[in-house]
Amino acid sequence: MARFDLQKLYIDGGYSDAGSDATFEAINPANGEVLAQVQRATKEDVERAVVSAEKGQKIWAAMTAMERSRILRRAVDILRERNDELAALETLDTGKAFSETQYVDVVTGADVLEYYAGLVPAIEGEQIPLRDTSFVYTRREPLGVVAGIGAWNYPIQIALWKSAPALAAGNAMIFKPSEVTSLTTLKLAEIYTEAGVPAGVFNVLTGSGREVGTWLTEHPRIEKVSFTGGTDTGKKVMASASSSSLKEVTMELGGKSPLIVFEDADLDRAADIAMMANFYSSGQVCTNGTRVFVPKHLQAAFEAKIVERVARIRVGDPQDENTNFGPLVSFAHMESVLGYIAKGKEQGARLLCGGDRLTDGDFAKGAYVAPTVFTDCTDEMTIVREEIFGPVMSILTYETEEEVIRRANDTDFGLAAGLVTKDLNRAHRVIHQLEAGICWINAWGESDAKMPVGGYKQSGVGRENGISSLNNFTRIKSVQVELGDYASVF
């Protein structure tokens, strides 16, 4: 029997039964427990959600900027009041350690919402003089109804990253969470309603991306799609959005990010950064720095520091506050990661630690994969070329700065990059040559609400967070005013 009641759709300010009896299971990856049965939205449900969103958006957009700002701030307060409850649910649904979800997932999502709530009154146009008797003014107007499609690794945070700027700009959003982790997004919908967001302004449709996601991207009255997920799926989303009605898209996609350790780096700091860039959230972070480049003569020393730190990882029940490394998000994803580890072994990478599923005791019930480090890796290996999205670090060696820049950029991805050095001249010189949208110097992973996030190459289109994201949920209308006489050529 499931732990929670049947999870329904959230449409028009409340829970609503789907148009069919079809459901799917929400599974706790730490032990295989069925958390809930979740309804699958139908195409008719998508239409209901769009109609509801259109109605709610008109009410929402007609409010003053200060009214919208106050309502969003109330939602921030409720999120923070319910932080531990939401974090515990996120841990059950994703397998992420409570020590992480309690301090990161809801907290940073609320920070983003608070940031955009403060920017609502700052949405403004320009006045452009043409001549003494004429001028132009511009208006930033909401797009209307937009869609958000989330990934499974940061469910509530991603829902907030997408909905916060969308709602701040006066839009309504229909959000489809990942089929793997749907539960906390439904709670977010409750919170928006409790805060005073009009019915229909934030609807949640659960179901598969192949069905619900496609129906949203193809819908002619949805003006924009904001998607987070894999690159292959992102290409399909972009094609569908453009072919249906030339929708705008924002996409945060896959990565295979380089972390470069230079010869003057503090190796302890470099090892700490590499650990965070590979094993935080059990390695399920799109920006992870999984290609770790180290000078050849420092390889052995660096490897020793990594092995020492891996031994300190506290793998365990994610609900235990002492645990800092939980299971992967699902058993299917575990098999995918284990497949990549097998390829690493087959292709000649040297295994430093990990490399298998954890099966001792209660671990056997869950989707646990040991923190894994390969070294002596080469650029053509599958584990170096493809995104694994799991706890697998690949160590590569290099000789010169020019070589490592070239090899770091030798990828179809361009989401993130980082380097560790004491030489600030080198730091800026190299970072400016790395083909990535998010870069860190002597750090890794922090993404403040004010910081635009997005990728180069096949890692994405557009940016999330920062002022640019708010602007991208508006469209500019130019209005010319003529105060003088008007002369026709006819």
UniProtKB/Swiss-Prot annotation:
Binding site for NAD(+): G150, A151, W152, K176, P177, S178, E179, G230, T231, D232, T233, G254, C286, E387
UniProt remark on cofactor binding: Binds 2 potassium ions per subunit.
Pathway: Amine and polyamine biosynthesis; betaine biosynthesis via choline pathway; betaine from betaine aldehyde: step 1/1
Enzymatic reactions: betaine aldehyde + NAD(+) + H2O = glycine betaine + NADH + 2 H(+)
Cofactor: K(+)
Extent of the signal sequence: none
UniProt KW keywords: Metal-binding, NAD, NADP, Oxidation, Oxidoreductase, Potassium
Chain residues that bind K(+) 2: L246, K457, G460
Site residues, Seems to be a necessary countercharge to the potassium cations: E248
Self-association state and partner proteins as the record states: Dimer of dimers.
Protein name: Betaine aldehyde dehydrogenase
Taxonomy, superkingdom: Bacteria
Active site annotation, chain numbering: K162 (charge relay system), E252 (proton acceptor), C286 (nucleophile), E464 (charge relay system)
